[in-house]
């Protein structure tokens, strides 16, 4: 039941642009992640003196740069356009603006409290992203 929030035309355009940019963005992986199992894929900046990746040679993987970022106005928003608010109990729902924000129930919330949160959210007309 994910409805779209009240977004301006500009914000909708920027959300679509962000989606396109993310599709084109390469997956930034650690240098030589494929060579040694113990390294893992998580990004680490190459610091070696002779590192081809650090020197940005043509054939080597790309490194993260500010140019890969998403537009400032829609940065951090859920793909639906809502601003996510983490909720731990039903009382937290009262602080949410249903027009711009959506709730995400915290992972450590149990089944009973989760049910209470869902009922109260429906009552207040708040979207729950992980319902």
UniProtKB/Swiss-Prot annotation:
Any Gene Ontology CC annotation: cytosolic large ribosomal subunit
Pfam family, one: Ribosomal_L32e
Keyword Ribonucleoprotein: yes
Presence of keyword Zinc-finger: no
MF terms (GO), sorted A to Z: structural constituent of ribosome
Single GO BP term: translation
Keywords, comma-separated and alphabetical: Ribonucleoprotein, Ribosomal protein
Sequence ranges of Basic residues compositional bias: 44-61
Region of interest: Disordered: 39-77
Family affiliation: Belongs to the eukaryotic ribosomal protein eL32 family.
PANTHER family: 60S RIBOSOMAL PROTEIN L32 AND DNA-DIRECTED RNA POLYMERASE II, SUBUNIT N, RIBOSOMAL PROTEIN L32
Protein name per UniProt: Large ribosomal subunit protein eL32
Protein's organism: Methanopyrus kandleri (strain AV19 / DSM 6324 / JCM 9639 / NBRC 100938)
Lineage: Archaea, Methanobacteriati, Methanobacteriota, Methanomada group, Methanopyri
């Amino acid at each position: 039941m994910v409805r779209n929030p009240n977004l301006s035309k500009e914000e909708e355009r920027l959300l679509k642009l962000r989606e396109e940019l993310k599709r084109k963005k390469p997956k930034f992986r650690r240098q030589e992640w494929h060579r040694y199992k113990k390294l893992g894929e998580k990004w680490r900046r190459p610091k070696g003196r002779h590192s081809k990746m650090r020197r940005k040679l043509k054939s080597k993987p790309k490194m993260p740069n500010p140019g890969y970022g998403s537009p400032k106005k829609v940065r951090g928003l859920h793909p639906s356009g809502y601003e996510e608010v983490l909720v731990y109990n039903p009382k937290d729902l009262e602080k949410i603006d249903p027009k711009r924000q959506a709730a995400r129930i915290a992972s450590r919330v149990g089944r009973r409290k989760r049910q209470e949160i869902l009922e109260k959210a429906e009552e207040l007309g708040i979207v729950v992203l992980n319902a």
